[in-house]
Regions:
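Interfaces and regulatory segments of ATP-dependent nucleotide/adenylate/phosphodiester-chemistry enzymes
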Residues: 2-3, 12-190
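Short helix-onset patch at the extreme N-terminus, typifying the N->h transition
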Residues: 6-8
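Hydrophobic/aromatic-lined pockets within catalytic cores
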Residues: 169, 198, 216-220
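Solvent-exposed, charged helical/coil patches
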Residues: 191-211
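Catalytic centers of nucleases
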Residues: 206-240
Length: 240
């Protein structure tokens, strides 16, 4: 007999994810103080979110979110036809909820558009029987450990999800790219430099250089000109 599968509400999942994300501390110390999750489980969560296998980073946010929305699902399930009691379609949930969440948060998980279509998750469920098909076996073991804990301790689903989101927020903070701020000077300083540059007589050459540079800058900034070209000087700096 075919076991029934569950459908996870996309709207509920998005709302809960937004709510928990807002509360996520993003700091290890705060997370430890609040969660009461065993250290080995917390460490496995941290390793999964920072996994070198990009696909694995999407697993815990997706699977645990489903468990938070519908406690009767088996959060190890990947496919609705996995054969597990409480099976659901994790790929659809990830694509509709977790992937958009990733995109609006600087692609912190990796920017994948369909992570559950990649080889590591072309399996019916995240169970140890599928370990042999995985290249990153240690990373897969971490996923199994966390999801097994969630199944054996279903009341911890929200805490596990919050812990996962804290790890994601911390990853985002640590991987944030800081761009160098270009040096800038005031208008007065610019005019002073131009005055000093033009003070020496050069037969109009320096004035031409300044004018060309200004037109090039204006053209690039406001997209006014395709090209700026200068011709030979045929006038002196000042009339004689």
């Amino acid at each position: 007999m075919t076991r029934p599968s569950y459908t996870i509400s996309t709207d509920q999942a998005k709302a809960l994810l937004d709510k928990l994300w807002t509360k996520a501390s993003g700091t290890i110390s705060a997370s430890k103080a609040e969660s009461r999750i065993p250290d080995e489980i917390r460490d496995a969560i941290d390793r999964s979110i920072d996994s070198k296998t990009k696909t694995y980073r999407y697993v815990l946010p997706t699977q645990l979110l489903a468990k938070c929305i519908e406690p009767d699902v088996d959060c190890r399930s990947v496919q609705a036809g996995s054969g597990l009691s409480g099976a659901f379609d994790a790929r659809s949930l990830c694509h509709k909820v977790v992937v958009p969440f990733d995109h609006v948060n600087n692609n912190v998980l990796g920017g994948s558009s369909e992570p559950y279509l990649n080889n590591p998750l072309r399996i019916p469920a995240i169970v140890r029987d599928e370990r042999q098909a995985q290249k990153a076996k240690a990373g897969f073991d971490d996923l199994c450990l966390v999801l097994e804990y969630a199944e054996s301790h279903p009341k911890t689903a929200h805490k596990l999800m919050s812990e996962t989101l804290s790890a994601i927020r911390l990853r985002m903070e640590l991987t944030c790219i800081t761009y160098a701020v270009p040096n800038r000077i005031s208008l007065g300083q610019s005019l002073s430099l131009a005055d000093r540059f033009l003070a020496d007589p050069t037969g109009g050459l320096r004035l031409q250089v300044v004018a060309e540079a200004l037109f090039r800058s204006i053209g690039e900034r406001f997209r006014l000109f395709d090209q700026v070209r200068s011709a030979s000087i045929n006038a002196a700096d000042a009339s004689t």
